[in-house]
Every structure is written in structure tokens, then in C-alpha cells.
């Protein structure tokens, strides 16, 4: 596989590229404008929380989150951003899952601003939160706050990202390397191993961007060496991605496109359409495209023949198991490496923390591709969220 970055040939994966996105080894993972922080809100579930267990117990594999857990106490939840369908779905699921699990929560919103996130965490603790569910977009900037929370014995569950350092009770995220590998195998198979493919990389300073990019590049090199990849770092910024796509198209015909997040979808389809390059699947000149997230707009594009596939990032399960693990932390439970009872696998993250890697399905128009799910499957959260 030949790889081009910004039209200059280079290795697909350099030694500095390790991964995360949604979306992490240093700076912020997005360059979008922060949204306004929402005031704290408290939600009391119908089932009253019970007292935390006095002595820690071991729970491995993880027990089901379908019923209220034993850990009582207020759980603080910060919403990281509201500039994508995915995160807006996560925000909607949190109070629903709190009710299901019998958790009492107080929420804040940090708008992709690490300073605001750290302040929100302090505020939530001051207002009585005994555990926190956070989704730090700046995985280096959260380190001092994690140290402060640890000194106060406040357990933290992080969603979607791994902090660069610092102790957390559990990381809840999907297997982002699988995103890159599944996307690679689908595109490579559809192209029969030959062609030019543009890759919209996320932010390589984020663990999600690194994981997806590393896995996609490794898979292409190993399995489809005749495919030339134009790996374009976008920092999760759509205008940057479209500019890079146009640069590639100025001197090349492309047969495939991998978008590491759904934020690129609408603008990409519009740009290709304006150039007469948006052809329906199954027709001559169609560009095989795979996205990542699992939002409704992707399923609609798949059914229209514009998009070929996406990887379903489980917004509903992020909310469910984020709260579940916060409850278990308050109950004094601990967890071990290995498979869980909810079709995931607990692994050791880079800094030694435990990470529950939730499954993420490949979604296609009819589910005929091996291992894929039909885009109209009602079990997909994107088909439930409106």
C-alpha cells in the first residue's frame, strides 16, 4: 500500500501515531467552537439509591446493568460537547439510563473546554457528587484534575477517551482499532484491492484518532498493498477535511473514502455532488465510502446509496455503562480483565487503568456483508433516537 499525506508520500503510520474518537495523548481533540456550558441539573431516578457497600467485592465478569446497582450517592455527569449528532444522542441517553439504573445525577456541560470541564468537576463535587462521569476531550489537560479528585477519593469514569495519565475507576469506550480495521477491510474488499483512497484522520493527538488511523493504515499495508492511501489529518475539523479532499482530487481520481467521524458526512456528500462525483452504489464511478459513528444521517445516506457503510459507536451504551460503573465504584466493587456479560471485553489501557471496550458493529444497507448489521435494524441506537 502506498500512502500519501498532503500529496507527499510518507508512511501510513509513524512512530508517533498510537490512537483514540471520537474521539489521545496530548492536546484537544477538536478545533470546533465550544458550545455554551449548561447550568447544573439534578435528576432523581424513581428508584432511590441504596447505601454503598462497606467492604469492596470483586465483580468479574461485569454484572448486568439492567437493574439498579448497590452503590448509592449522587453521580456528577459532564456533557463534553453538543456539536454532533453523536454527542447530542449521548446527552439524551444519560437521564434515561439514570432512571433505568436508579441513579441520582447532577449534570453540567463543558462545551469542549478543558478549563470549564475542570471547573465543572470541582463544582459537582462541592455540590455533593460522590462519583463523576466525564468525557475529557483534552486528555492531557484533565490530568491535574484527576489527581485532585483522587486525593478526595472521588471515583471517575471516563467516556470515549483515555486520559494520558491519572487514575480512573473505568474507561468506557468502543474498540477504536476495530473501527479502523473494519473500515479498511470493507473498502479494500469492495475495491478488490486496487485504487486510491482518501482517509479523513481525526486528531492524532487523541487516542481515538490515533487508534483508528493506526489500525486503518496497518490493515491496508498488510492486506491491500496496491491501494494508495491519502492519509489527511483533520483534527476533527470538517472545513480542513474538505480542503484536503479537494487538494487530492485536483490531481487524482479516487475510488474510496474513509471518514473517521460522521461530522464530515454532509459536507463531503455536498462537495462530491457539486463535482459530479457522487454516484449511487452499484453504478459506474461510485466512490466507496465508510463513515464512523452510527447516527441516523449515516443510515439515511446508506439507504440512498451515497454512503456504503458506517461503524456504530454505541452512544446508548456509553451512557448506560458510564453510570453503571460509577454506581459500582460507590458500591466498592472491583473488576478484572476479560469478557463481560454485555458482549464487551475489559482490557488494560495505556496508563494501566481498566477499559471496558464495548462492541461496535459494521452497518451496511442489507447486512449481507459478513459480520455487518442491516441499516434499518431497529436495535441500532441511531434508529431509535429520531
Name every feature range the model reports, one short phrase each.
Residues 116-129, 239-253:
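Short, well-structured alpha-helical segments in soluble
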Residues 23-33:
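Bacterial lipoprotein signal-peptidase II cleavage site
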Residues 1-13:
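Bacterial N-terminal signal peptides that target proteins for export
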Residues 140-178, 196, 295-303, 307-308:
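Flexible loop/hinge segments that line or gate small-molecule binding clefts
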Residues 78-92, 106-116, 137-138, 161, ...:
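Hinge/beta->alpha junction and helix N-cap segments in small-molecule ligand-binding domains
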Residues 71, 208, 219-223, 321-386:
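Hinge/cleft segment of the Venus flytrap/periplasmic-binding protein
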Residues 157-164, 262, 269-307:
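Venus flytrap/periplasmic-binding-protein-like
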Amino acid at each position: 500500500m502506498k500512502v500519501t499525506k498532503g500529496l507527499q508520500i510518507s508512511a501510513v503510520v509513524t512512530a508517533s501515531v498510537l490512537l483514540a474518537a471520537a474521539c489521545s495523548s496530548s492536546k484537544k481533540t477538536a478545533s470546533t467552537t465550544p458550545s455554551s456550558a449548561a447550568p447544573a441539573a439534578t435528576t432523581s431516578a424513581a428508584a432511590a439509591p441504596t447505601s454503598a457497600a462497606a467492604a469492596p467485592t470483586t465483580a468479574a465478569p461485569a454484572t448486568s446493568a439492567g437493574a439498579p446497582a448497590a452503590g448509592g450517592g449522587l453521580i456528577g455527569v459532564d456533557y463534553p460537547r453538543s456539536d454532533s449528532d453523536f454527542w447530542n444522542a449521548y446527552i439524551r441517553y444519560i437521564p434515561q439510563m439514570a432512571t433505568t439504573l436508579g441513579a441520582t445525577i447532577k449534570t453540567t456541560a463543558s462545551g469542549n473546554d478543558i478549563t470549564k470541564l475542570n471547573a465543572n468537576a470541582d463544582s459537582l463535587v462541592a455540590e455533593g457528587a460522590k462519583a463523576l462521569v466525564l468525557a475529557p476531550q483534552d486528555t492531557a489537560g484533565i490530568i491535574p484534575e484527576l489527581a485532585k479528585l483522587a486525593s478526595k477519593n472521588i471515583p471517575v469514569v471516563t467516556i470515549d477517551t483515555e486520559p494520558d495519565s491519572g487514575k480512573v475507576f473505568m474507561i468506557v469506550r468502543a474498540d477504536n482499532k476495530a473501527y479502523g480495521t473494519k473500515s479498511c477491510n470493507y473498502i479494500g474488499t469492495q475495491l478488490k484491492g486496487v485504487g486510491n483512497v482518501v482517509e479523513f484522520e481525526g486528531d492524532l493527538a487523541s487516542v481515538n484518532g490515533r487508534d483508528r488511523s493506526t489500525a486503518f493504515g496497518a490493515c491496508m499495508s498488510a492486506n491491500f498493498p496496491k491501494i494508495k492511501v491519502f492519509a489527511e489529518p483533520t483534527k476533527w475539523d470538517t472545513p480542513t477535511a474538505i480542503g484536503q479532499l479537494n487538494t487530492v482530487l485536483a490531481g487524482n481520481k479516487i475510488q474510496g473514502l474513509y471518514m473517521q467521524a460522521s461530522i464530515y458526512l454532509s459536507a463531503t456528500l455536498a462537495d462530491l455532488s457539486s463535482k459530479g462525483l457522487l454516484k449511487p452504489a452499484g453504478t459506474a464511478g461510485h466512490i466507496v465510502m465508510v463513515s464512523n459513528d452510527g447516527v441516523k444521517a449515516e443510515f439515511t445516506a446508506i439507504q440512498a446509496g451515497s454512503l456504503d457503510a458506517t461503524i456504530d459507536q454505541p452512544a446508548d451504551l456509553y451512557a448506560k455503562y458510564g453510570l453503571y460503573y460509577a454506581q459500582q465504584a460507590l458500591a466498592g466493587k472491583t473488576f478484572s480483565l476479560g469478557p463481560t456479560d454485555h458482549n464487551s471485553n475489559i482490557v488494560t489501557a495505556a496508563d494501566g487503568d481498566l477499559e471496558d471496550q464495548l462492541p461496535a458493529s459494521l452497518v451496511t444497507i442489507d447486512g449481507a456483508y459478513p459480520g455487518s448489521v442491516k441499516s434499518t435494524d431497529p436495535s441500532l441506537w441511531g434508529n431509535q433516537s429520531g
